[in-house]
Amino acid sequence: MSTNGHDPHPESTKDKVLVPEELRPRVPKAMSVAASDSGAGAGIQSDLKTFAAHGVYGTTAIVAITAQSTKGVYAIAEVPDEVIVAQIDMMMEDIGADAAKTGMLSSALIVEVVADRLGAWGVPTVVDPVMISKSGDQLLQRNAVNAVKRHLIPMSRIVTPNIPEAEVLSGRTILTEDDLREAARAIHALGTEWVLIKGGHRTATATDVLFDGVEFIEMPSERIQSLNIHGTGCTLSAAITANLALGMAMVPAVEAAKSYLTGAIRAGYAIGGGHSPVNHFYRFPEMGPSAAQGTSDGARAISTTDGDR
């Protein structure tokens, strides 16, 4: 008790005013189920920054911890499956999510656990089938590919592979436009609603293709060389997730996400000695050194897979 007669906890006084629940502003919410990147350029950290930049409240379920920098991935420690389940269930039970995304899920067990819980909660899910990092490090165990195809893709709203990932998921080599479309059909047949194959790994063009099972929508991009390419795949899928949480339909959600990524790459920071990260907050010049760069979403399009991951 206070010796001077004053309440030491003024927040507990009777004159405290509580805002009624119905008057509190509703905030769109999104969940990222992925790995932690100690360099903060990709993974959970990148997803949270992307959500925040879109005005979306982000929650997480961390499935692995990586020792990672702009130069590569040096160690991976998986989180026990019961802890992954607890993270997803506790967040969904309390906070909920208008949309979710998956990133690096390194093992078949983790893939199955995540697919089961997100499917049980019925949250619209963006599946970013992360397999290999930009530095060439294997992030998805080879025996986990079938789990992705059998468990994760069927419960997803959209799958966002780059060319190498699309080849693995479809079992097809992609050299031509026809190859890409056949791969999209094969991936769509696994049970997802939409497929976005990111074309930046093709040398001749940098056209992303969005497919809903009926119509192919080509999204051409100008290929721009940049060192700020770490985490671009994570950022794109997180931006799509944020836009879905905001209530956007799929086509405009993807278009807006591509535009956001363009600006984030152009305003990227010079950080580290490898592939530098993008600037997730380029729209807010007061938050970083990009104020003088004059970046905007009106900038020319950029391939969403130049430096994917």
Ranges and model annotations:
Residues 4, 27, 78, 251-309:
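Charged C-terminal helix
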Residues 16-32, 48-138, 284:
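Conserved N-terminal subdomain of the carbohydrate kinase-like
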Residues 18-26, 43, 204-219:
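Acidic-glycine-rich active-site phosphate/pyrophosphate-binding loop
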Residues 33-39, 216-230:
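Short pre-catalytic strand/loop immediately N-terminal to key active-site residues, enriched for Gly-Thr
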Residues 45, 50, 167-168, 226-250:
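Short, small-residue alpha-helix embedded
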Residues 54-59, 217, 243-258:
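Phosphate-handling active-site elements
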Residues 142-216:
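Conserved phosphate/ATP/ADP-binding segment of small-molecule kinases
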